[in-house]
Regions:
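Histidine/lysine/aspartate-rich catalytic loop segments that bind and position anionic ligands
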Residues: 122-156
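Anion (oxyanion) recognition and catalysis
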Residues: 96, 118-121, 171, 191, ...
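Alpha-helical substrate-recognition element adjacent to the catalytic core
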Residues: 2-131, 135-136, 219
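Acidic, Mg2+-coordinating phosphoryl-transfer loop and its flanking beta/alpha structural elements
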Residues: 106-107, 174-216
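Non-catalytic pre-domain segments flanking phosphatase-related domains
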Residues: 1-18, 25, 37, 244-276
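Short, charged, surface-exposed secondary-structure boundary motifs
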Residues: 135-141, 206-213, 225-229
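Conserved Lys-Pro-Asp/Glu-containing loop-to-beta segment of HAD-superfamily phosphomonoesterases
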Residues: 151-185
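A polyampholytic, Gly/Pro-enriched intrinsically disordered region
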Residues: 143-159, 220-223, 233-246
Length: 276
């Protein structure tokens, strides 16, 4: 917000990370539990998401440790749904009701992320994830059964700056882009969007907490609604269950569970919403 009249402009597009943001797990770690490699993969994942190792250095290394089958990746859809944050579906439904274009942008495996997106009512063309490459000869190929995933198709999302590069392609006159995520790849994309909200409700990553323009500490996504909507746009939620989620989100900003890095901007944001 600029100096002058206090106002907040609605966003046109909101991009959510998946693992550690919409859901309370890291999918790649869940895939390892049957392989006895959970600790090794969790350590690699945390190193990448905290910025200690570049994502491209660990992505295929993690996949090689577990070599998941298509059936196991499909099983992730169930795991994602079981660990979906309690208000995630309500927040996304409210954004849709207000005409916001909601996208998922994730370094996760495409089939699982798309399955979650279907459950949340997000069209496939708004889901951006990594497509695995299967070994067609390692399984029961004579019955049409593929072998395990042995790599991934080329994608910017397996690189540390991949989300930033992908989001740059969405910038256009009249669009306002917002990104919500918990990891270093999300933080790196901060310059590609008009607002980045770091999410620490599942995993606390110090670099994200210290550098995100907005940081959310609570294990809820309700603060996204007042960030994404203007008070005028939010009138569409009056009298619906989403109005309660909006109020919860504002309360998080008032009690410090969500905050702007710039305290002046934080106060001006609260002024915009003082009537609710």
């Amino acid at each position: 917000m600029e100096a002058g009249p206090v106002r907040w402009v609605s966003f046109t597009h909101v991009f959510f990370d998946c693992d550690g943001t919409l859901v309370g797990v890291e999918g790649i770690v869940e895939l390892t539990r049957r392989r006895g490699q959970a600790m090794a993969v969790a350590a690699l994942t945390e190193a990448a998401m905290s910025g200690h190792l570049p994502l491209e250095a660990v992505y295929e290394q993690r996949l090689a440790l577990i070599r998941p089958t298509r059936a196991e990746i499909q099983e992730l859809i169930r795991i994602y749904r079981e660990h979906l944050l309690p208000d995630a579906a309500g927040v996304i439904h409210a954004l849709h009701a207000c005409g916001i274009s909601v996208h998922l942008i994730s370094g996760g495996l495409e089939e699982a992320v798309r399955g979650l997106g279907r459950f949340l009512g997000i069209p496939a063309q708004r889901i951006h994830a990594v497509r695995p490459r299967y070994d067609p000869f390692a399984g029961a190929w004579w019955r049409g059964e593929e072998g395990p995933a042995v790599g991934v198709e080329p994608s910017p999302l397996i690189a540390q700056d991949g989300k930033a590069r992908l989001l740059e392609g969405f910038r256009a006159p009249g669009r306002r882009l917002m990104l919500v995520g918990d990891g270093i790849t999300d933080l790196i994309a901060q310059g590609a969007v008009h607002l980045f909200a770091g999410f620490g409700g599942v995993f606390h990553r110090p670099a994200v907490a210290e550098n995100a323009e907005v940081y959310i500490r609570c294990p809820r996504l309700a603060p996204i609604l007042p960030l994404a909507l203007s008070p005028e746009r939010a009138r569409a939620l009056q009298g619906t269950p989403a109005e309660g989620i909006l109020r919860e989100g504002l309360q998080a900003f008032r009690n410090g569970e969500a905050r702007f890095r710039d305290p002046v901007r934080h106060e001006r944001f609260l002024q915009v919403w003082h009537a609710l």
